[in-house]
Amino acid sequence: MMKTILVLEDDPKIAIALAVRLEAAGYNVLTAADGVRGLKLALVNRPDLIVMDIWMPVGLGLSVAQRLKDLGFANTPVIFITASRLKGLREAAANLGAAGYFEKPYDPEQLLGAVHQALQQHTFTA
């Protein structure tokens, strides 16, 4: 069964590039440019994994991730991406149980590897 990945990214170029790469790897991809739309898509589609920018309009990624956990997505792997170098973000993501954390610009192959690994771990422990 094809796995579904939700990409929450407000930069259209990054969102499209990420979606194309994930689709080429065999995943079904949904995209949202803000946290509110991302929450709605998650609730309706129940993705297997979420890739989320930390800084988005209408919903800071960390807050959206916490809200998703509260709504029953505690076991859904989340990989964070960010252009920010603020101290404490990586730790905050880890405290939310992040499956990965990548600073932009990131290596697309490493991100894809983290997606594969998170989905395998999730599949075997579910």
Indicate where each model-derived feature is located.
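Active-site beta3 strand of CheY-like receiver
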Residues: 45-51, 56
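Alpha4 helix (beta4-alpha4-beta5 surface) of REC/receiver domains from two-component response regulators
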Residues: 63, 85-102, 113
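C-terminal output helix
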Residues: 106-116
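Acidic catalytic/metal-coordinating carboxylates
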Residues: 34-37, 60-64
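Conserved acidic carboxylate
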Residues: 9
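The feature encodes the CheY-like receiver
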Residues: 15, 57-58, 71, 86, ...
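Charged docking surfaces used in two-component/phosphorelay signaling
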Residues: 16-24
